[in-house]
Amino acid sequence: FFNFYAPLSIYVTAVFRFLGFSYVQSIQLAQLAGFVVAAWGAFALARRWFGSSWAGLLTAVAYTTAPFHMVNVYMRGDSLAEFWAMAFYPLVLLAADGVWSRSWRGMALLALAYAGLILSHNISALIFSPFLLLYLFLLFLQRSSSSSTPAVNRSQFTARSAAALVLAFALAAFFFVPALAEKGWAQLGPVTEGYFHFSNHFRSLDLVQTTAVFDYSVDEGQAFAMGLVQAVTAVAGIAAILFFLLPRRKETEAEKEGTVAFSRLLFILVTFAVATFMITPWSRPLWEHVPLLAFTQFPWRFLSVQAL
C-alpha cells in the first residue's frame, strides 16, 4: 500500500501521533496544518503577484474556503492526501518565481515544493504539472521578449528550472520508483473501470451550483461542483483582468517587471479556462488519448486547480 499511496500526509499525521495525540486528534491536527499551509501559500503568492497584502488576504480566504477544498476534508474523508496537495499548489508557483530572482536558492525551493506535491498526492501532481510547465514557459517567454534581459540569464533560468524539476523527482524517487517497478503486481485495471471511469464524472450544466449557500450533499455528486459565490467571484476577477488590468498595464521602470506581471495575468486566465474545460464532456478526446490522464478517474479533480 505504501508503495502506491503518496505518503506525505501520513507522515504529517504520524508526527502529531508521536507527540502524544490520539489517532483522531492527529488527523484533525494534520488537517488544520494543511489549512494553515494552504492559506499562507496563497497569501504569499498573491502578495508577490499583486504587491498588496490585501490581495494576499483575499486570495488566502478564497482559496482556503473554496468548496472543493472543504469537500476534501469534510465530505470525502479519505482525501487527506489530495487536501495536502492543494496546500502545495501556491507554494510551487511561488518557488517558480524564485528560480529567476533567487538563483540557486530559488532552484532548491522549487525542487522541495514540487517534491512535496508529488509526495502529497501523485494524481494531483499529474494534474498540476502541465500548469507549472506553462507558468515556467510564460516566464521564459516574457523574459525573452524584454530587451533588458540578457540572453545568458534566460539560459540560466531554463537550466535552473530543469534542474529543479529533476531534483524534485530525485527527492521523491523513494516513493514513485518502487510504485512503477511493482505495478505489475498490482491490479491497476479496476481503478479506471466501471464507476471509476472518467466518463461517469463529467460536469456540464451542473458545473456550478445554483444556490448561494453551497450544498455539500453527496447525492449525484452534487458537492463536486463550483459554488455559486465562487463562480461569481471568479467571473468578476476575470472581468477585472480583461477590462482593467490588461488594457491599463503599464511597463514599469524595470521592463522585466511589467512583462512578468503580464505572464501572471495570462497564466491566471489560461489556467482557469483549461481547468474548467477539463471538467466538462468537451474534453473527452483528451481524456481518451492523453497518456495516464485516465488514472485521474474524476474530471472534477480539476476543481482543485480551478480554485487557485
List each model region and its residues:
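Membrane-proximal lumenal/periplasmic loop motifs of glycosylation machinery
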Residues: 1-7
